[in-house]
Amino acid sequence: MLFTLKKGELFGRLIAIGRVIVGIYAFLAALCFMSMVITGTAAFDALCLSLSGVATGGLTPQSAPISAYVGRVSSVILAIFCFFGAMNIAIIWDALRLRRWRNIYALIRNVEHRGLLAIAMFISIFGFFFVGFSQAFTIIIESLYFVSSAGFDYNVIGIELLPPVILIAIALVGGSALSTSGGVKIIRVLLLFRHLNTDMSRLSHPSRVVPVSFKKQHIPDRAFLSIWMYFFGYTLFFAFSIMALGATGFTFEDAVATGAASLSNIGPLLPATLPESGLTYADFSPVQKLISAMFMLIGRVEVLAVLVLFTPSFWAR
């Protein structure tokens, strides 16, 4: 186990893991960059978008929508690599290292990746009812950008026409574990639903022994305790963000949208959920920017590690 290694072995293992992660993301970013340049995107724009897309950061070299300076083919390429950024990096590493069909097929067969595709399809199909099939390409592309938590804005008319509650819920769920995407992560949500289903079965049959299994593996109760603690911590920080932003003068709707955008690290979620208010980050006061940045950092690191800082036992000698 990693935490039972000696100090020298621990740092050696961390360096080895770091090299693998850097190598994978450098390879994907370089491949995305070359593909976008070949399909007609300017080199500087392609460089910025490829680095931001694979890292699901959502930063763009221009303030205009992506459709204003990137062609359709390049937009599809960027969406694909954003989706790679939201995938489990361990499974990507196995596929690249072993280079066997069954390992490549595992990228698609993985339950988290199928969940990402299902969410993207849900956004696309749901979006057709609001914007029509004339904007089908925009909805499909923006759904891939959104589920990866990159959140690029492809066109002026897109997913911002969808109900804000749906967008916020999807943003808080996030992407795959061991990925650069934000949110609670799909695997945790799936396990929580599996555990909830088992508990409901125990209510109807109290004496029945119902072990919880996932992907043919038994999941111990202590694992679910950690997941529930993470979910509680994430929900708690979301509530804190709403209260903190509300105390600065935000309306409840503005505070919820900003808190969700900050914790999930999807900046464009704010204008997407509040298009009629016209609220942007440029309108924030210094205090509001500081609060938003703080919860962005909390959403990017391990929530439980931050939550421990607020316990008296951590500061006790």
Walk through the language-model features, giving the residues of each.
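Membrane-proximal intracellular helices of multi-pass ion channels
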Residues: M1-R317
